[in-house]
Structures are given as structure tokens and as C-alpha cells.
Amino acid sequence: MGKTTQKGHRQKSFYRGVRAEKWAAWWLRCKGFHIAEIRFKTKCGEIDLIARRGNLVLIVEVKARSTLAEAMAAVSRVNERRIEAAADIWLARQKDRALLCVRFDLIAILPWRWPQHIPAFFMSNK
């Protein structure tokens, strides 16, 4: 693959991810969640979506794949640790952090299907 082709592929993947995150955010809003952050970036990693409903905080990884199995397999243990570290930074900035219940979810965006929301996709080691 040449430089132009690699750049084009990365750019296409980036915009596909942005569209998937917007679709997932819409889905969570339909479920009554407030979107607190989109693409929350830290030096430790990035969280695709942070959503709140009352004291429940969802830390959401969004994956656009052909199948649910591919989306689930795309989140490695290393990814989980990075997401956890970024979540710790976000939570430390919340005044009501002691009251919050945090859950790590996955939303899979699949072709021609409604988003697939997998609650508690992984658990924190803390």
C-alpha cells in the first residue's frame, strides 16, 4: 500500500469512527442518557463516549464492524486498561464522583442494523 492509499484508508477509518460515535450517541439519547463527553482524550487514552443518566455513568467504547463478534473482539485487554485510566481522569474531575456508579459498555455499529448496546462489556479491576 502506498503513502496516498494508507493516508486515504486512515482518513476513511477516522470518519467511519466519527459517524459511528454520532450514531451511538443518538442511540443513548433515545434511551434517556445525557452525553457528557464525546472523544474524551487524555495522555493515557481516549474514551469514545461518556453518558450519564442520574448517578449512572456509562464509559462507552464504540466499534463499527461487520459483525457483533468482530466488534467485541476489537476491544483488547490493553484497550480496556487505557479506557479505565482515561475514565479515572474524567471521574477525578467530577464533583459528585463519590455518588457515581460507573459501567463500561460497548456499542457495536453494524451495517443495516440498529446499534447493538452491550452493557457492562468489561469490568474495572478497581
Swiss-Prot record:
Pfam families for this protein: UPF0102 (PF02021)
Molecular function terms from GO: nucleic acid binding
UniProt protein name: UPF0102 protein BH12350
SUPFAM superfamilies: Restriction endonuclease-like
Domain of life: Bacteria
Family that this chain belongs to: Belongs to the UPF0102 family.
InterPro entries per the UniProt record, alphabetical: Restrct_endonuc-II-like, tRNA_endonuc-like_dom_sf, UPF0102_YraN-like
